[in-house]
Amino acid sequence: MNWGIPFRHLLLVLQLALLPAVTQGKKVVLGKKGDTVELTCNASQKTTTQFHWKNSNQIKILGKQGSFLTKGSSKLRDRIDSRKSLWDQGCFSMIIKNLKIEDSETYICEVENKKEEVELLVFGLTANSDTHLLQGQSLTLTLESPPGSSPSVKCRSPRGKNIQGGRTLSVPQLERQDSGTWTCTVSQDQNTVEFKIDIMVLAFQKASSTVYKKEGEQVEFSFPLAFTLEKLTGSGELWWQAERASSSKSWITFDLKNKEVSVKQVTQDPKLQMGKKLPLNLTLPQALPQYAGSGNLTLALEAKTGKLHQEVNLVVMRATQFQENLTCEVWGPTSPKLMLSLKLENKAATVSKQAKAVWVLNPEEGMWQCLLSDSGQVLLESNIKVLPTWPTPVQPMALIVLGGVAGLLLFTGLGIFFCVRCRHRRRQAQRMSQIKRLLSEKKTCQCPHRFQKTCSPI
């Protein structure tokens, strides 16, 4: 029998077995500090062969002995594991939990006379301080990285703004829209890992608001917050600058504790009313021209540096009629582009100007509308009814004057009438007197003649 060939085959197999394991290409895996990573290692065949994980110093970390998982005396001993259920499929991964920056190094998997190298790079991205920041404050994100790495960071804010940087990334002047989840991508050697950081921007829902009211109407000021906290404690104050006043003054001060509001001090004119629960609400009993102006509500939160601010404006409208003049006026901060108009109902505007007062002389009878509008959108409207001319306040005085004149004329006429009548009677009396006198003279003259006629001889 020829034993040469089998012996040569056995020798070749023995030599191959003694050869060192072949090293495969190195893979790069990026991990996040505090997270879990799985380093994969696969055999060419589905088998339950032996495998070992080591670090770059050839210290055994994890392996398989029979059907059991064995762990070495490395610093990862309490944070490593493997998926035993996948061993029979030729998958021999190493799972590292609660990653640390110092876990960054090269790990070697030995299986089937081959070596697979995996370079693990662990990064951490954290906010410089609290993730609850006041509107207007700055956000700084700091990247922790292993020595020798040169990563880049790109973050996208909830409002879609992109910010790029290196190991430090700064975002000045945070806005209310920046509140939410920030998505940051760390890149290294064409590999990426994604971080999500929740940032809460403490702010009011609106930076500024304007309330439009007719004179005499009740005014409601609302200051809703753009965030929700379980425990909310602080203090606030509303300062008001009236348009007609030379300086601003404090209208109300209050405390906020566990979302409940208590008033500390309030002015007597005007006497504001405040709700006892969030959102912050203030009520002004009447909108008057002397109250029109601008206010600034500040809210200081406990354990926070700085204050929240919201500006509020009050615009008051008045429509009046005096004598033959119909006037429409507004008080308070208004944009120069706003239009103020006076129009008869269902008719075109009689007057329309970019002004704070308009008027119409001798207005027609009917319902007039005073309108404050912005690009065709009516912001404020006040109606006033113009009555017919005769009942206007000026007529009674005219009637009194006319009555006086008529009375004077009548009195004068009656006086003249009675004077003429009196003269007429006097003349008539004089004439009668003359007639009587003449008649009496005629009688005395007739007696002798009558006597002579009777005594004459026959």
Swiss-Prot record:
PROSITE patterns assigned to the protein according to its UniProt record, in alphabetical order: IG_LIKE (PS50835)
A GO molecular function held by the record: MHC class II protein complex binding
Residue positions the entry lists as glycosylated: 42, 281, 296, 325
Gene3D superfamilies: Immunoglobulins, transmembrane domain of human cd4
Residue span(s) of domain Ig-like V-type: 26-125
Compartments where located: Cell membrane
Mod. after translation: Palmitoylation and association with LCK contribute to the enrichment of CD4 in lipid rafts.
Extracellular side: 26-396
Keywords assigned: Adaptive immunity, Cell membrane, Disulfide bond, Glycoprotein, Immunity, Immunoglobulin domain, Lipoprotein, Membrane, Palmitate, Phosphoprotein, Repeat, Signal, Transmembrane, Transmembrane helix
GO cellular component: cell surface; plasma membrane
Disulfide bridges in this chain: 41-109, 155-184, 328-370
InterPro entries in the cross-refs: CD4, CD4-extracel, Ig-like_dom, Ig-like_dom_sf, Ig-like_fold, Ig_C2-set, Ig_sub, Ig_sub2
Chain ranges of the Ig-like C2-type domain: 126-203, 204-317, 318-374
Top-rank lineage group of the source organism: Eukaryota
Lipidation (S-palmitoyl cysteine): 419, 422
Residues with the Phosphoserine modification: 433, 440, 456
CDD domains per the UniProt record, alphabetical: CD4_CD, IgV_3_CD4
Keyword Lipoprotein: yes
Cleavable signal peptide: 1-25
SMART domains per the UniProt record, alphabetical: IG, IGc2, IGv
Membrane topology: Single-pass type I membrane protein
Transmembrane segments: 397-418
Domain notes per entry: The Ig-like V-type domain mediates the interaction with MHCII.
Subunit (UniProt): Forms disulfide-linked homodimers at the cell surface. Interacts with LCK. Interacts with PTK2/FAK1. Binds to P4HB/PDI. Interacts with IL16; this interaction induces a CD4-dependent signaling in lymphocytes. Interacts (via Ig-like V-type domain) with MHCII alpha chain (via alpha-2 domain) and beta chain (via beta-2 domain); this interaction increases the affinity of TCR for peptide-MHCII. CD4 oligomerization via Ig-like C2-type 2 and 3 domains appears to be required for stable binding to MHCII and adhesion between T cells and APCs.
Name this protein carries in UniProt: T-cell surface glycoprotein CD4
Species assigned in the record: Chlorocebus aethiops (Green monkey)
Lineage: Eukaryota, Metazoa, Chordata, Craniata, Vertebrata
